[in-house]
Design a protein with these regions (language model features):
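Gram-negative bacterial Sec-dependent N-terminal signal peptides
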Residues: 1-22
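Flexible loop/hinge segments at secondary-structure junctions
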Residues: 23-341
């Protein structure tokens, strides 16, 4: 079963979540990460079947940043109950939450995921390193003591070991948590391999590492991974950025790249040898636990071993499950009402 076809009845756009909240406060409202979206959609559908006394939650997307922004809008019927996120909540977001009266932000880790680079299945495999990715997308690169416009148009110009294909990188836009992990673990890591950039002051370094070319070779996707996949269909030479779970469900269409000679897998992500991985989360609004029907039950159901552990439906859909010890700690913190400080 394809992730993008699962539980469509409970998936809505991020914009719709806030507008329908007043009309359906016997229904849990969720928005956020495109990476977490398919997993949350599966759980929402199964939750509705398992607990007929509660309505199936309404799951929206909008990206991690978009979901957390909605989450931190305040407390009450017109605000969402859960924000899905492919990264930890930032201090600035937590401050925004508290300013709006959301003081009980409870973090729920659900498992792990890798960020993968994949091309059309009919194309040659890529063996990428962070410096390759940075050299492909940077607006400017150091040359003879100064920064010049990126001269590279084909991958093999960067490194002869790479395919002789035109450079087109399809990456998540800034509203996605995936973008932040991609920036930190691939782009920044690649940028830092240039001695000339490391010698710059911090502001100049940041600009050099985060300013991408605007000549059509870098395409930013604000939507979910299905949109990235569609771009690869129309641009067969493109390399796209996906979550490992999405790639697992589309192996017939995609060829995954190695990073630092390591292929992404459950084993390489858990042992840390694959460098572009992250934990996945959702955040629960503690102030809503008593007023929103089923919110407590949904949270405990999601992190149960049956739902998201080894051999579960979520693992089969691509989620890398936590250890029993981690799961027990997450559940204990939730039951104790432990909020993010």
């Amino acid at each position: 079963m394809r992730l993008n076809h699962i539980a469509l009845a409970v998936v809505v756009s991020g914009a719709a979540v806030a507008t329908t909240a007043n009309a359906a406060r016997d229904t849990i409202q969720i928005a956020g990460s495109s990476t977490v979206l398919p997993y949350a959609s599966i759980v929402a559908e199964e939750f509705g079947k398992t607990f007929p006394q509660f309505k199936a939650p309404v799951v929206g997307s909008g990206g991690s940043s978009g979901g957390l922004k909605q989450f931190c809008n305040g407390v009450g019927d017109n605000t969402i109950d859960i924000a899905n996120s492919s990264r930890k909540i930032k201090a600035t977001e937590l401050a925004a939450c508290k300013k709006a009266g959301v003081n009980q932000v409870i973090e729920i880790k659900i498992g792990y995921d890798g960020i993968v680079f994949a091309s059309n299945a009919s194309k040659a495999a890529y063996k990428l390193r962070p410096q390759h990715v940075y050299a492909a997308l940077a607006a400017q690169l150091p040359s003879n003591g100064k920064m010049v416009a990126n001269p590279y148009t084909r991958w093999n110009q960067i490194d002869k070991s790479l395919p002789n294909e035109p450079i087109t990188l399809v990456i998540p836009a800034s509203n996605h948590g995936t973008r932040e992990v991609f920036q930190e673990k691939m782009v920044d890591a690649g940028c830092e391999t240039y001695a000339a950039i490391k010698a710059m002051n911090k502001d100049a370094q940041k600009k050099a590492c985060s300013t991408f070319r605007k000549d059509g070779k870098v395409i930013e996707i604000a939507g979910d991974y299905t949109e990235t996949l569609a771009r690869l269909k129309t641009s067969p030479s493109a390399v796209g950025v996906f979550g490992l779970g999405f790639y697992d469900q589309n192996r017939d269409k995609l060829r995954v790249a190695t990073v630092n000679n390591v292929a992404p897998s459950e084993k390489t992500i858990l042992n840390g040898s694959y460098p572009v991985s992250r934990p996945l989360f959702f955040y629960v609004k503690g102030e809503h636990l008593k007023s929103i029907k089923g919110l407590k039950e949904y949270t405990e159901y999601f992190i149960s071993k049956k739902v998201s552990g080894k051999g579960s439906k979520l693992e089969r859909a691509g989620l890398i499950s936590m250890s029993d010890k981690e799961r027990a700690a997450v559940l204990a913190n939730f039951k104790a009402g432990k909020a993010v400080k």
